């Protein structure tokens, strides 16, 4: 079965139909929509993204697949070869070191030979949309890609030369010579190649470059955090510039750096952990042993008269909570990401993908963590896309985009449904468990708790 995407309209035709629209000033380019047209368990699904988005559903529903989709777009935005970007380039550090879950082959839906993804980025230039088709039969390549700004096509691909690994690319140019066409390598994201291929000699070309820069900036700083408590319990080497790994295995080294570099953030982290702890917690610390090359560090919870509990003895839930809180309260400076350093900090935004945020935590504890996230994401420099098994921790919290994820029993495809705020209020007299499972049961489009559940497509 061959996977194809609709053919993009000619640039000239698209340009004639566009009318200028006023766009409010946006300081940081922001991913506001993820389109999963054909990716793993998804078909034609759309995930809206707010500063704080919670995707919930049972294990196997496809929540992790949605996080993987945004991770794949982020990897492609770095401009490396597609296969190595998704299968991993090796080494210990960097966003491309390890493969995406399942590698490139695992991203392709069963029985298909292509990945089709897209996103929308709100920027100071307007709404930038990217759509990309990656074919995996024969040579792994970009089969189709388009970049638009407020509906105007700025870049689109055409015919391919499979033998030479090239794809004809046309980009907008408002000079008398018309749009520019050139064959570009099809082994990496075309949009990521534009800054090196477009001269910027005309107003139209500068518009293309600006839109591409806004999109790439928004996608590059995506960090997927899936803490592995077993890996967090070991003594680690001190690192003056420690950056947290996706597994949080080096969290003790990161805490040691944070404690000495920023007492203010350290105090905020302590308050966040104290708010979620089920017992009085006096402080956080980092134990040390050995000297010189043998010096090692271990995070410690100070429980007062109960003593000091090291990370090697702490519960899975508390270790995961510590890792999530540390990332939310410190930002990209201590994460193993490849930031767009050419862009000022004030114009960049971190997107944190939090896998199974509530694992090992009670509903109240997960709720405390979400309240921290709501406070932090309100400042515009961090956005959070988190997954939960049950929605209980997010119910009643203002400012949370709540989306249900489930499988279609007929097709097996993952479905996404946005839960309207009015539908989150539990009906009087229902049990706590029923309230937590509020949006499951009736089919799409029915009314729950007085509000409609909006179907986001298959």
Roles of regions detected by a PLM:
Residues 357-359:
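Short loop immediately C-terminal to the Walker-B catalytic DE motif
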Residues 2-43:
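N-terminal pre-Walker A segment at the start of P-loop NTPase domains
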Residues 127-267, 271:
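Electropositive, glycine-dotted interaction segments
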Residues 51-93, 248-249, 317, 321-330, ...:
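Phosphate-binding glycine-rich loops of NTP-binding sites
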Residues 6, 250-313, 457:
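Extended helical coiled-coil dimerization/tether regions that scaffold
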Residues 2-7, 12, 18, 367-458:
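C-terminal lobe/lid and adjacent interdomain/linker elements of RecA-like ASCE P-loop ATPase modules
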Residues 68-139:
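Conserved P-loop NTP-binding catalytic core
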Residues 303-305, 311-354, 364-368:
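GG-anchored amphipathic helix commonly corresponding to the ABC/SMC/Rad50 NBD signature/C-loop
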